[in-house]
UniProtKB/Swiss-Prot annotation:
InterPro entries: DUF520, UPF0234-like_C, UPF0234_N, YajQ-like_sf
Ranges that cross the membrane: none
Organism, scientific name: Salmonella typhi
Role noted for this protein: Nucleotide-binding protein.
Keyword field contains Nucleotide-binding: yes
Annotated GO CC locations: cytosol
UniProt gene name: yajQ
Name of protein: Nucleotide-binding protein YajQ
Family: Belongs to the YajQ family.
Any Pfam family: DUF520
C-alpha cells in the first residue's frame, strides 16, 4: 500500500550557509559600514540572532537573511520571528527560531483537511510527522497538492514515498 510522510524540517547546514552569505553581504554593503550589525546561527537552540544599532537596520538584516535563506531552499515561513525587537543599551536584536517539526495544532488541521477532502487515504499522526497511506498513488499525489496549496504558516516536505 503506497504511503508517504509529511514533515517540516530545516537543514541546518543550508541555514548556516544562508547565514554566512547574509553576513558576507552585510559586510560589503555601504549602508552597514561602521555599524555594529551581526547575524549569528545557534545550532544548539536552532535560533538565528540578528543584532544592529537600530530597529530599522534589524528589519533590513532580516530581509537580507530571508532572501539568502530562500536562495538556499529554506522558505521564510520556516523562520519564526517575534513581532517585538529587544532593545538593550545601544543595540536592538531579535532571536528568530527555525521551525523544526509540525506542532500538534497544525497536525490536527492537516489531518482534518485530508479527511474533509473525501480522498480515499488514511492520515495518522506519528510524533512530529504525519503518515499518509492510500490505495492509489494518484490519491497520495492529490493529498500532496492539497497540503501544498493550503496556507498553514509552515513549509512542508514529503518523505519516504513508497509504493
Amino acid at each position: 500500500m503506497p504511503s508517504f510522510d509529511i514533515v517540516s524540517e530545516v537543514d541546518l547546514q543550508e541555514a548556516r550557509n544562508g547565514v554566512d552569505n547574509a553576513v558576507r553581504e552585510v559586510e560589503s554593503r555601504f549602508d552597514f559600514r561602521g555599524v555594529e550589525a551581526t547575524i549569528e546561527l545557534n545550532d544548539a537552540n536552532k535560533t538565528i540572532k540578528v543584532l544592529s544599532e537600530s530597529d530599522f537596520q534589524v528589519n533590513q538584516l532580516l530581509d537580507i537573511l530571508r532572501a539568502k535563506l530562500l536562495k538556499r531552499g529554506i522558505e521564510g515561513a520556516s523562520l519564526d520571528v517575534p513581532d517585538e525587537f529587544v532593545h538593550s543599551g545601544k543595540t536592538w536584536y531579535v532571536e528568530a527560531k527555525l521551525k523544526q517539526g509540525i506542532e500538534s495544532a497544525v497536525q490536527k488541521k492537516i489531518v482534518k483537511l485530508i479527511k474533509d477532502s473525501k480522498l480515499k487515504v488514511q492520515a495518522q499522526i506519528q510524533g512530529e510527522e504525519i503518515r499518509v497511506t492510500g490505495k492509489s498513488r494518484d490519491d497520495l499525489q492529490s493529498v500532496m497538492a492539497l497540503v501544498r496549496g493550503d496556507d498553514l504558516g509552515q513549509p512542508f516536505q514529503f518523505k519516504n514515498f513508497r509504493d
